[in-house]
Amino acid sequence: MSFNHIKKVIVGMSGGVDSSVSAWLLQQQGYKVEGLFMKNWEDDDSTEQCASASDLSDTHSVCDNLGIYLHTINFSKEYWENVFQVFLQEYSVGRTPNPDILCNKEIKFKYFLEFALQDLDADLIATGHYVRRVDMNKKTYLIRGVDRNKDQSYFLYTLSYKQLKQCLFPVGTLNKFQVRNIAKKLNLITANKKDSTGICFIGKRKFKDFISKYIPIRPGVIIDINGNTIGAHQGVSFYTLGQRKGLKIGGVKQGNGQPWYVIDKDTSNNTLIAAQGRNHPRLMSIAFITEQTQWVKRDALTSPLHCTVKTRYRHPDIQCQIYPLLNNNLKVILKIPVLAITPGQSAVFYLKERCLGGGIITKIYHC
């Protein structure tokens, strides 16, 4: 009997194809597999929001097909307090947070992990993320998924070294086409199910309509870089740096006649600042500061390091030099200027395929 046969793994099941195939792959590797479906948002399930009744039904179908037991748990309270409230607080002060990263940090790899290990007596947990855990030379590394188009390491940079050693990512060595083919051969109900996109608690609703229920709309003015009023906005929280659409100032003709873009948000005066041209100097950054820096590797950074950084999901890696500051903060010097780096977003650092960690962007330096 192999070592894997005595290992119990709880798979986070979402009702999607990736977690479905993850469960089957682990079965093939000899693990004792059980599933767990998390409900993270209280809402009317008939409105097709995340954690809906249909997702749970699909998960039950997959588990029945694979012959594994399914646990269910409600983490809505934990999600509200540790993810959604933080999301609202950040937006209310003009920053643009990433709720998926918060959810992974606070729910999937904290409450789910603790519940699986302590209450369900599991040895490990697994998720359907497209990343790889590699054990080599008595060390464990978080590596990008083989499918670079689906790689999700950006969302998992908050994993601690200890947490990483308690996790498995079965589909990280496959591409999406292979995953769907496996699901089709197994006749899983999730085989052709579309990938979830966007912010889960918003679903198909318009972002502004949803957020305005929690953050009061405070109309204000849009000004140019000289302080001239050129339009009106519906609340600085609803705009992001580099945004072009929805400003309704296209008819304002100045300078070079190029389109207008949001280049800054003055939250204290409830003012939006816009300038013309996608490559305006106020939109281009050559350096920034990160706070709340977290490392997947065992030790924090103590000396400058040359690596690459990703400032948003699906954005290309940029060569950079990172310098440790006090309180585990970093200064990041970019090799080339980058467009619309946004406070509140995460900067994630890599050495080739290896994800080192990351932090929250708090201050940017323009060209």
Swiss-Prot record:
It is an enzyme of class 2 (transferase). Its main location: cytoplasm. GO terms for molecular function: ATP binding; tRNA binding; tRNA-uridine 2-sulfurtransferase activity. Its EC number is 2.8.1.13. Keywords: ATP-binding, Cytoplasm, Disulfide bond, Nucleotide-binding, RNA-binding, Transferase, tRNA processing, tRNA-binding. It catalyses: S-sulfanyl-L-cysteinyl-[protein] + uridine(34) in tRNA + AH2 + ATP = 2-thiouridine(34) in tRNA + L-cysteinyl-[protein] + A + AMP + diphosphate + H(+). ATP binds at residues 12-19, 38, 128. GO terms for biological process: tRNA wobble position uridine thiolation. Catalyzes the 2-thiolation of uridine at the wobble position (U34) of tRNA(Lys), tRNA(Glu) and tRNA(Gln), leading to the formation of s(2)U34, the first step of tRNA-mnm(5)s(2)U34 synthesis. Sulfur is provided by IscS, via a sulfur-relay system. Binds ATP and its substrate tRNAs. This is tRNA-specific 2-thiouridylase MnmA.
